[in-house]
Structure formats: structure tokens, C-alpha cells
């Protein structure tokens, strides 16, 4: 890309994929928490970054009853909560669930946040689920656009079939 003088939107630092095997609480449509947390931790290890370096998470978050479980899994995997937790959002609040295209579409949105220095809001997030409010400060779940320099962002998909993926992007600097 440098040799071609192409625009570099972000650097892929690392990532991980795994499956919960539809065991324990994992089902065809619900993730296995142990596998989700392992996926997040392995992605961080693969990218050689610490949880405190994450500026924003573009979560799987589908506005369902499992959102609080996803947030709980993030807090456990990262060891962060309250105001130390990174910002978290979900593109699904703007475009709906793109099904098999979700990971790709949401990765583009994540990279654009890095490139253009903003955190997109969680639209229609009027009443924060009490279980989420107990884990993460409400300021970390933006309901309005935030202009902010983003250095590191994670995109997560904890999808159908109990299959998990996390990819970590970083702002590219020459």
C-alpha cells in the first residue's frame, strides 16, 4: 500500500476466532460466555495490546436480552468496568442486522471511526438496561456522536452457531 501510495485506513493488529461448541449456555443463537471471553483475550494477545489501550468496541450487540451478557463478557475478558471501560457501540442501531454481511459492514464502520476520528452513537438507546448500567458507566455507551481521536478499536461478532470473532484495528502511522 505504501509503495502504491494507497490510502491506508487502519492497520489490522490481530484477532481471533473460535466456537463455543453450543455447550453450556451456548446455542445456535446464543453465545457461550467462556468461549466469548477466550476469543476476546486471545485477540488482545495476538495483537499484543493491553485492554487499557482500547478506545472503542464495536460490539455484536443486537438490542436483545443477550446484550447484558455480552457486556458482562467484555468486562470479564478486559478486566475493565465503570468509567475505565472503553466506549462501546453497535452499528446495528443504525442499519439493523446485516446477517452474514454484519462482520464486514461493521468492520468498515469501525475503521471509519479510526480514520475520521469519531465514535458513532447507539441510536434509540433511550433506557439503558439496568444490568448493563451496573457494569459500565452510561457515558461509555454514547447516544450522540463523539469527536475523538481513535487509536485502537475492536470489532466483535458473536454470531449464529455460537461462532465468535474479534479483530483489532489500529490507526496507521508512517
Feature locations, PLM:
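Condensing-enzyme catalytic core mediating Claisen C-C bond formation in acyl metabolism
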Residues: 1-47, 55-56, 174
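Active-site-proximal gating segment of KS-fold condensing enzymes and close homologs
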Residues: 66-81
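Conserved small-residue
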Residues: 12, 54, 58-60, 107, ...
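Conserved beta-strand-centric core segments of catalytic alpha/beta enzyme folds
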Residues: 1, 100-174
Amino acid at each position: 500500500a505504501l509503495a502504491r501510495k494507497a490510502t491506508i485506513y487502519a492497520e489490522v493488529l490481530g484477532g481471533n476466532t473460535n466456537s463455543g461448541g453450543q455447550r453450556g449456555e451456548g446455542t445456535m443463537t446464543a453465545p457461550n460466555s467462556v468461549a466469548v471471553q477466550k476469543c476476546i483475550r486471545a485477540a488482545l494477545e495476538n495483537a499484543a495490546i493491553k485492554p487499557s489501550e482500547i478506545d472503542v468496541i464495536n460490539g455484536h450487540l443486537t438490542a436483545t436480552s443477550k446484550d447484558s451478557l455480552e457486556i458482562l463478557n467484555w468486562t470479564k475478558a478486559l478486566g475493565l468496568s465503570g468509567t475505565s471501560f472503553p466506549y462501546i457501540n453497535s452499528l446495528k442501531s443504525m442499519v439493523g442486522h446485516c446477517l452474514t454481511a454484519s462482520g464486514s459492514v461493521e468492520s468498515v464502520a469501525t475503521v471509519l471511526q479510526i480514520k475520521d476520528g469519531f465514535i458513532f452513537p447507539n441510536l434509540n438507546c433511550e433506557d439503558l438496561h439496568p444490568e448493563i448500567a451496573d457494569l459500565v458507566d452510561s457515558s461509555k455507551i454514547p447516544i450522540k456522536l463523539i469527536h475523538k481521536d481513535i487509536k485502537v478499536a475492536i470489532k466483535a461478532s458473536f454470531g449464529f452457531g455460537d461462532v465468535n470473532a474479534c479483530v483489532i484495528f489500529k490507526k496507521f502511522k508512517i
